[in-house]
């Protein structure tokens, strides 16, 4: 797209929102089946929406990922499905694999059509027998001459339809690989789509794909460089997980905006429920979850923009974002609206499966949490525990006993290295000091002082956790991989501590008192969960005061969020 970068970006983002707003206002967003209308997708293509992450050289906008993620939060307040499709298309679909791993020839061939929306894209990884366990993939591509012939079945593929372009993960000579595949406009014996009833993602196309000797040109194979096809897949998934967190922030803003009118209208025992502590607590806590998700989104997107792989950080954002959205939907939004939540046309009842589904797609939360933990301990295990195992193997010792002098002598080198680390850690931990951003030092505001306390708490907690992590590795040794419950639990606590640190640092740089108060409340609650304590009266006063401020319109950006009409209204006396 031509024009100055700033002008093009502003225009495309503004016009994309306008397209969605117009169709929402006219009631023309969905067709008779409840799917997004083709006209909507074309209109979005006309204004450059599908090229947000495509380089300008190929007709796209070339947004940074931070710009893209922040925009998704705004868009999700209008329509979360369209925001989700932007991620499917640009992150886990064909765009990111091509931009990152494609040759110049491949980019020139595919990206212009993806940028203008002539071809929309999807990501085909999951199979009937392979979800979290990607070693179970069965779809294969066999080369004959200048063509790969693909045979296999994919499942739960969002945004797939005839005539679209997919990133296909398959096995080539037993190794995972990624092919860019232009699906034909019509189904055939070689390619067909498999429909099924699906509660979630009801406004998008989500189907299975069955291939039988389906031809794909050899030149459509992406080169991962170091690694294999899963390297390509994870690169896109990292971005998709950040986008999920950004989407969750927008969806929760929509929930909060639609809690307020009902809380003002509904009266119990002569007073509007907006005056009740429980409702105020729900609104205050929801605001905290929103700020935490926005903090995680900015943090992880910034890391990706700086060139970091960010896999562990993106996992934290995905898990927290999806779990926060689930908690917000069930514990805060539904309970405030009561029975009306289940009426046709209610935001909760119509979308409850979409509110819950992010806990599963792009990696189920606890499975991802274990992957996070394994990545976290990998270097420590390699440095200290692997040498112990190698020494035992060399000496043929199967059941080590440190009371046996020969065993102790065989392990003297590796054990000494570990002992130095352990003693040094125990000695230095109480004396560690942490340097925090200048904003903390310069401000005397109570909000900043409390946020500094949260940041210091989480930093110290994470430092201390190194001993618990190492102790867990020492206790279970080679059986650690089978101790899934312990790994998931410890991983979850580490993730919460990171969320506290990121949220407190993010809010301290924010100049809005309500944002800082929301961050303070959610950090306080997450610290309580980490410590296993009970909520204090001070916390209840803090979160309900925040809820009162939100009910009076003081949460930034909420006035721009659509509010649905009340269902089954009545005359208040």
State each model region's role:
Residues 260-261, 278-305, 497-506:
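Loop-to-helix element that buttresses phosphate recognition and phosphoryl-transfer chemistry
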Residues 147, 151-191:
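A short core secondary-structure module
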Residues 409-573:
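C-terminal amphipathic alpha-helical interaction region
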Residues 187-213:
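Flexible, small-/acidic-enriched active-site or ligand-binding loops
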Residues 48, 312-417, 513-573:
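Alpha-helix capping/hinge segments and adjacent helical runs
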């Amino acid at each position: 797209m031509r024009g100055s970068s700033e002008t093009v970006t502003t225009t495309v983002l503004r016009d994309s929102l306008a397209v969605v707003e117009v169709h929402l206002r006219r009631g023309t967003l969905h067709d008779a089946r409840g799917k997004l209308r083709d006209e909507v997708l074309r209109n979005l293509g006309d204004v450059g929406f599908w090229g947000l992450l495509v380089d300008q050289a190929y007709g796209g906008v070339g947004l940074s990922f931070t710009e893209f993620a922040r925009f998704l939060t705004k868009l999700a307040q209008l329509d979360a499905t369209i925001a989700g499709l932007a991620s499917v298309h640009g992150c886990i679909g064909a765009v990111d694999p091509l931009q990152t791993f494609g040759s110049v020839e491949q980019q020139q061939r595919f990206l212009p059509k993806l940028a203008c929306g002539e071809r929309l894209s999807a990501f085909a990884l999951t199979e009937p027998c392979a979800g979290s366990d990607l070693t179970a993939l069965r779809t294969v591509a066999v080369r004959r001459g200048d063509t790969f012939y693909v045979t296999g079945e994919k499942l739960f593929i969002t945004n797939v339809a005839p005539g679209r372009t997919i990133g296909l993960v398959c096995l080539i000579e037993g190794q995972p690989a990624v092919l860019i595949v232009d699906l034909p406009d019509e189904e055939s014996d070689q390619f067909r789509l498999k429909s099924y009833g699906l509660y979630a993602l009801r406004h998008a196309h989500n189907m299975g794909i069955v291939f039988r000797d389906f031809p794909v040109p050899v030149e459509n194979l992406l080169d991962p460089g170091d690694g294999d096809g899963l390297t390509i897949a994870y690169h896109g998934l990292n971005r998709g997980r950040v986008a999920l967190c950004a989407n969750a922030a927008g969806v929760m803003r929509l929930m909060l905006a639609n809690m307020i009118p009902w809380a003002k209208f509904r009266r119990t025992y002569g007073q509007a429920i907006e005056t009740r502590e429980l409702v105020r607590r729900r609104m205050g806590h929801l605001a905290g979850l929103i700020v935490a998700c926005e903090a995680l989104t900015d943090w992880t997107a910034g890391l990706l923009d700086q060139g970091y792989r960010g896999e562990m950080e993106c996992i934290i954002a995905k898990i927290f974002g999806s779990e926060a959205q689930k908690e917000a939907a069930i514990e805060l939004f539904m309970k405030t609206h009561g029975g009306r939540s289940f009426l046709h046309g209610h935001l909760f009842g119509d979308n409850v499966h979409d509110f819950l589904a992010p806990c599963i797609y792009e990696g189920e939360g606890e499975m991802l949490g274990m992957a996070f933990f394994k990545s976290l301990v990998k270097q420590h295990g390699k440095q200290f525990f692997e040498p112990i195992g190698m020494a035992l193997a060399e000496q043929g010792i199967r059941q080590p006993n440190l009371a046996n002098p020969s065993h102790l002598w065989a392990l003297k080198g590796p054990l000494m290295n570990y002992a130095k680390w352990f003693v040094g850690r125990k000695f230095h931990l109480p004396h560690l000091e942490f340097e925090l951003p200048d904003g903390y030092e310069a401000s005397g505001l109570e909000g900043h002082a409390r946020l500094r306390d949260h940041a210091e708490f989480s930093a110290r907690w994470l430092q201390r956790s190194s001993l618990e992590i190492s102790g867990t590795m020492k206790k279970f040794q080679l059986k650690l991989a089978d101790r899934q419950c312990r790994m998931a639990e410890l991983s979850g606590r580490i993730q919460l501590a990171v969320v506290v640190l990121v949220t407190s640092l993010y809010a301290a740089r924010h100049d809005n008192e309500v944002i800082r108060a929301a961050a303070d409340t959610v950090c306080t609650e997450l610290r309580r969960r980490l410590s296993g304590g009970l909520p204090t009266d001070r916390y209840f006063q803090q979160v309900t005061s925040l809820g009162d401020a939100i009910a009076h319109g003081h949460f930034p950006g909420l006035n721009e969020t659509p509010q649905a009409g009340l269902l089954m209204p009545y005359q208040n006396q």
